[in-house]
Curated annotation (Swiss-Prot):
Residues given in the record as [4Fe-4S] cluster binding sites: C508, C511, C543, E550
This protein's name: 4-hydroxy-3-methylbut-2-en-1-yl diphosphate synthase (flavodoxin)
Known EC number: 1.17.7.3
Top-level taxon of origin: Bacteria
Gene Ontology terms, MF aspect: 4 iron, 4 sulfur cluster binding; 4-hydroxy-3-methylbut-2-en-1-yl diphosphate synthase activity (ferredoxin); 4-hydroxy-3-methylbut-2-enyl-diphosphate synthase activity (flavodoxin); iron ion binding
Lineage of the species this protein comes from: Bacteria, Pseudomonadati, Chlamydiota, Chlamydiia, Chlamydiales
The entry's keywords: 4Fe-4S, Iron, Iron-sulfur, Isoprene biosynthesis, Metal-binding, Oxidoreductase
Pfam families cross-referenced by the UniProt entry: GcpE (PF04551)
Any one Gene Ontology BP term: terpenoid biosynthetic process
Cofactor binding mode and count: Binds 1 [4Fe-4S] cluster.
Cofactor: [4Fe-4S] cluster
HAMAP family for the chain: IspG
Catalytic activity as recorded in UniProt: (2E)-4-hydroxy-3-methylbut-2-enyl diphosphate + oxidized [flavodoxin] + H2O + 2 H(+) = 2-C-methyl-D-erythritol 2,4-cyclic diphosphate + reduced [flavodoxin]
Length: 602
C-alpha cells in the first residue's frame, strides 16, 4: 500500500498584534470573538453580557459605537471591567462616524472600521462614474481622513481591524471594481497602504460576506495579495449574517472551517442571530474539530493555495436522470435499517409522503443499498420514488491508498465512491486525477460519539470545503439519523451555492443598534415563508447601518429603519419605508405577491 502525500495545511505566518492583554497572530492560539447585543449606553447590561461571554470562553468582545454617547458609555464599561478584574479586550465597532473612532480609541483596546463607510459614502447605486483624476483625489481624501486615527492608534499602542463587508463597499470602489471579490480586496488594500506608509502594523483584516463562497474566495485573495507584498497581517474570520439555528451553524462552518483547514485565520466569530452567548460553544467546537487535525498534519509547501476546480479536478455529475447538471444527494441505507424499520416510517424519513406520494424538496435523489437487499419489498417501494444504487456496483476507494485511486480497475468503473476522512487527502485525490472525467461520489460518515452540533460542524467543514471548489459529482451520507442527513446535505449544498431547494434566510446576529427582537421576527418570517420554492433569499436586518449593504445578494429585505418602523427592500432598493412593525410582516407577504413569488401554503 502506498503512503499518500497528503496536501497539508499549517497556519499562515502572521505578525503578533497586541489587543489589551492578549496577542493575536500565528504564534498564538486562534481567538474567539463575539459582539454584545445590548445597547452600549446600557452600561450595566453590557458589562453583564461581556462577563457572561468571557465565562463561556470568549476572548475578545466588540460593542457598537454610533456616536459620542456610546463613546462615553465605553469609558464607563471599561472602568467597570477593570474594577471587576475582567481583562477581556474591548473593541469599538465604528460606522459612518470617524470622530467616534478618534475619541473612543482612548478607552478601548481596538477599533473596527469598515472601509466602505469610514471616509467614503456607501454605494447608493446611483451610477456615478469616477474619472482617474477623481479617483486619485478620493484616495488622497481617504489618506487625510484616515491618517489621524492611524496616528492615534500607533501612539497609544491600540489595535485596529479593517473589516470589509461584501455589499457595503464604497461608491468609489464599487464603480471601479464592482460589488466583487476584487472590490473587497482593493478596499482593504487601500487602507492597508495608509497603515504601512505610517509604519503602523497592529492591524487585523476581515473580508466577510453572508455567502460562504464569496467569503472564502475573498479571504484567499486577500491573503495572497498581502503575502505578495510581505504584509503578514492577521485575519479575523466570519460569515456575516449567517442566520439562526442549524442553517447558521452550517454556513459558518462551511466558510470558517474551509479557511481554517487551509491555515488561514487568527480569530473567528460565528455570527448567529440571537444571543451572542450561543455563538461561543459553536466557535469552540469549530476550532476543536479543525485546528487539532491541522496541528497533526504539519507543514506543507503550498499551505493556502487558491483552490479551484480547474486546479484540482473537474466536477462531473452522474449522467443519470434526474441528475443532468444537478449535484445529487444520496443516503446510505444499511441492511439493519432496511430490515428493522417500518416501511412507512422509513419512506417518511426520506421525505416521501406515503399518502399522497408527494416528494419533499429535501428528499435525496437516491439511496445506496446492499446488493442482497435490492429485491426486498421496502427497496422496491423506495424505487418507485427514488433512484436506487447497489453499494457493490462501484469501487469504494480507500483514502490512504493512492495506487488504488489510479488503478485501471478504478478508472474503468462507471463511477467511484471516495471516503472523505479529511479535506487535504481529498484534495490530493482530485489533484492526482485532475484529467479524469470519471464521476466521483464523495462518501461521508460521522463519528456516532459526536454531539449534534459537533456532527453538524464536522460534516459542514469537511464537505463544504470540497463543494466550494467544485469537487465531486454527488454526496453519499451514511448516518443513522436519515432526517438529519437530508437536512444537513441540502443545507451544505445550499451554503456552497451548488443547489437551492429551500428559501435561504440572511439575518444579522444583532448588536446595540438593533431596533427590534431580531430572533423572534426572523423566526416568524421563516414560518410564514418557508414553504416558498428554493432559490429565494430573504434578509432580516436589525438596522439600516449595515442592513441594506450587507444583504448584498438577497432578493427581499426586512430592515429596521427607526424604533418601531421597518423598511422593505427589493434587491438594493427600498420600496416601502417607515412601516409600523406590527404591519411589516403582512406588508412583506404583500410585496412577495406583487413580485410573483408568493404561493399559499398547501
Amino acid at each position: 500500500m502506498a503512503t499518500p502525500c497528503i496536501q497539508n495545511a499549517f497556519r499562515r505566518k502572521t505578525l503578533p498584534v497586541r489587543i489589551g492583554d492578549l496577542f493575536v497572530g500565528s504564534e498564538h492560539s486562534i481567538k474567539i470573538q463575539s459582539m454584545t447585543t445590548t445597547a452600549t449606553t446600557d452600561v450595566d447590561g453590557t458589562v453583564r453580557q461581556i462577563c457572561a461571554l468571557q465565562e463561556l470562553g470568549c476572548d475578545i468582545v466588540r460593542v457598537t459605537v454610533q456616536g459620542l454617547r456610546e463613546v462615553h458609555a465605553c469609558e464607563h464599561i471599561k472602568d467597570r471591567l477593570i474594577q471587576q478584574n475582567i481583562s477581556i479586550p474591548l473593541v469599538a465597532d465604528i460606522h459612518f462616524f470617524p470622530q467616534a473612532a478618534i475619541h473612543v480609541v482612548d478607552c478601548v483596546d481596538k477599533v473596527r472600521i469598515n472601509p466602505g463607510n469610514y471616509v467614503d459614502k456607501r454605494n447608493m447605486f446611483t451610477g456615478k462614474i469616477y474619472s482617474d483624476e477623481q479617483y486619485a483625489h478620493s484616495l488622497e481624501h481617504l489618506m487625510n481622513k484616515f491618517s489621524p486615527l492611524v496616528e492615534k492608534c500607533k501612539r497609544l499602542g491600540k489595535a485596529m481591524r479593517i473589516g470589509v463587508n461584501h455589499g457595503s463597499l464604497s461608491e468609489r470602489v464599487t464603480q471601479r471594481y464592482g460589488n466583487t471579490i476584487e472590490g473587497m480586496v482593493y478596499s482593504a488594500l487601500e487602507y492597508a497602504e495608509v497603515c504601512v506608509a505610517m509604519d503602523y502594523h497592529d492591524v487585523i483584516f476581515s473580508m466577510k460576506s453572508s455567502n460562504p463562497k464569496v467569503m472564502v474566495a475573498a479571504y484567499r485573495s486577500l491573503a495572497y495579495e498581502l503575502d505578495q507584498r510581505e504584509w503578514s497581517y492577521p485575519l479575523h474570520l466570519g460569515v456575516t449574517e449567517a442566520g439562526s439555528g442549524t442553517a447558521g451553524i452550517v454556513k459558518s462552518a462551511v466558510g470558517i472551517g474551509t479557511l481554517l483547514s487551509e491555515g488561514l485565520g487568527d480569530t473567528i466569530r460565528c455570527s448567529l442571530t440571537g444571543s451572542p452567548i450561543n455563538e461561543i460553544p459553536i466557535c469552540i467546537d469549530l476550532l476543536k474539530q479543525t485546528t487539532e487535525l491541522s496541528e497533526r498534519w504539519g507543514e506543507a509547501d503550498n499551505p493556502f493555495a487558491i483552490h479551484s476546480s480547474k486546479q484540482l479536478g473537474t466536477r462531473n455529475t452522474l449522467n443519470t436522470p434526474p441528475w443532468d447538471n444537478v449535484y445529487g444527494l444520496l443516503i446510505n441505507l444499511t441492511d439493519v435499517q432496511l430490515l428493522t424499520a417500518e416501511p412507512i416510517e422509513l419512506l417518511q424519513c426520506l421525505g416521501i409522503d406515503t399518502t399522497t406520494g408527494k416528494i419533499d424538496p429535501t428528499t435525496p435523489e437516491g439511496v445506496v443499498v446492499p446488493k442482497a437487499m435490492r429485491s426486498s419489498p421496502i427497496v422496491s417501494e423506495i424505487e418507485k420514488h427514488l433512484l436506487v444504487f447497489n453499494k457493490e456496483d462501484a469501487p469504494i476507494l480507500n483514502p490512504m491508498n493512492e495506487e488504488e485511486w489510479l488503478s485501471e480497475e478504478t478508472l474503468s468503473a462507471p463511477f467511484v465512491y471516495f471516503e472523505v476522512t479529511d479535506i487535504h487527502t481529498a484534495r490530493r485525490f482530485f489533484s492526482l486525477r485532475q484529467h479524469s472525467t470519471q464521476p466521483v461520489c464523495l462518501s461521508f460518515s460521522l463519528d456516532p460519539h459526536l454531539s449534534k452540533n459537533e456532527a453538524i460542524i464536522d460534516l459542514s467543514a469537511r464537505l463544504g470545503a470540497l463543494l466550494l471548489d467544485g469537487l465531486g459529482s454527488c454526496v453519499l451520507l451514511d448516518f443513522v439519523d436519515i432526517k438529519l442527513s437530508r437536512t444537513l446535505g441540502f443545507l451544505i449544498l445550499q451554503s456552497a451555492n451548488i443547489r437551492s431547494v429551500t428559501v435561504e434566510y440572511v439575518s444579522c446576529p444583532g448588536c446595540g443598534r438593533t431596533l427590534f427582537d431580531l430572533l423572534a421576527v426572523s423566526q416568524r418570517i421563516r414560518e410564514r415563508t418557508k414553504h416558498l420554492p428554493g432559490g429565494l433569499k430573504i434578509a432580516v436586518m436589525g438596522c439600516i447601518v449595515n442592513g441594506p449593504g450587507e444583504m448584498a445578494d438577497a432578493d427581499f429585505g426586512y430592515v429596521g429603519s427607526k424604533p418601531g418602523m421597518i423598511d422593505l427592500y427589493v434587491k438594493h432598493k427600498c420600496v416601502k419605508s417607515c412601516i409600523p412593525i406590527e404591519n411589516a410582516e403582512e406588508e412583506l407577504v404583500q410585496l412577495l405577491k406583487e413580485h410573483g413569488v408568493w404561493k399559499e401554503p398547501e
